[in-house]
């Protein structure tokens, strides 16, 4: 499992690095961008390979730090805010993982595979499992931490392709796959199932009321992650891993195609005014539509093999009617926003008739997209053979089997209707813009869990800043140190400007001290009963040598000073 997943990470990373050659070719900091991408992939590899919790934490923390650097790569206020939101949201998961590491040390080691036998017996394992779930839902942006994933689209599109497909958001899913026994054996899976169901439903509705191209794809990532967590909480680990790999393929292709479209139309992302692009960029739009159909679960594409299997398992699972309806309505919403995107790409309005150079990108980007589209068409079948060597045969009544197809058809029809009558709703329904903003902004969850939680700490911080940082703390702290340093520097400056006088004064003082010492040496010796046999002559010799030495140094120093200050001649050496 580890080797297969890390091979997908390296494959998609390689295509993303090829993709950046033409996307940000004129960037001055291109080498820094490549270094960040490689460090990002290395952190993900460190997290995947090692089962030790310390190694997982190193890779986990590296993903959070480097993702902040990548999100703020474009130097603007929007990127800064998105980077701070991404970083602080992931910090919650880091704290939970640190507590988990400290707690599991009670068993004697950080390698969790040694303690799987304690899962059914020890109550403390429930606490560790809860901490793992908290860490995972922050990284995979589940409710209530869903606000950072749509905001992270401020990063360059190659970064979004890597983050949403195989690295940052999938890190939380992979952590749950590795620790699945910690919560599947307990009641924690029921809470995880509820969180995943709400995330699927809210993100599906939000994508249908959103007009930002990259944000729609980001919300679809949120929906697919919820789908993976939902099937994982039921207990089907291999199927969750299967869909994780297939999702990585079509999501990388979706973001690369979206980046090509945005790049060619000068960074404009509103889908309402960039329609009918199939006439100008046929290859890119074809690849984009194939990836969208794979997202819907179109038969014989890679997404079909995993999504159809998940739907059949949900139909046979022992769940209540509320969760059943929530799941199938969310599936219809996925098809709805996917067909909405396809409609705008094929038939929508195009308001850039004055831009004459709109075509498919160069050979390098087309090569990256072609590599993904080939794997997209064949990868589902190949992965099914690798992960499930024995075929899975599910028998169910025809009516229940047709329910999946009916849901997808209804979702596509509703998506087509929404695309055609959005202007009608805007004119006829009262407060339509408010409803669209509420549903498109994920039910104001970003506003509640960013501004709503942080507003009071920020107010208290402002009070502390006024009373401490801008009050007595500043007066007796930094400002007082500054005044002391300034006073000392003035004194040293005075000494430095008068160093010749000071040097001569020190020489004179030293001369007086030696003279007094020699005069009173005989009396000191008599008082201390010393015998003077040639000692006085030695003291006189020492005095004469010191006098000559200071005289020589004084003359040389004076000559150097004169040459430097008056004549501009190089000082004597």
Residue ranges, per PLM feature:
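Core, highly hydrophobic multi-pass alpha-helical transmembrane subunits of bioenergetic inner membranes
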Residues: 1-573
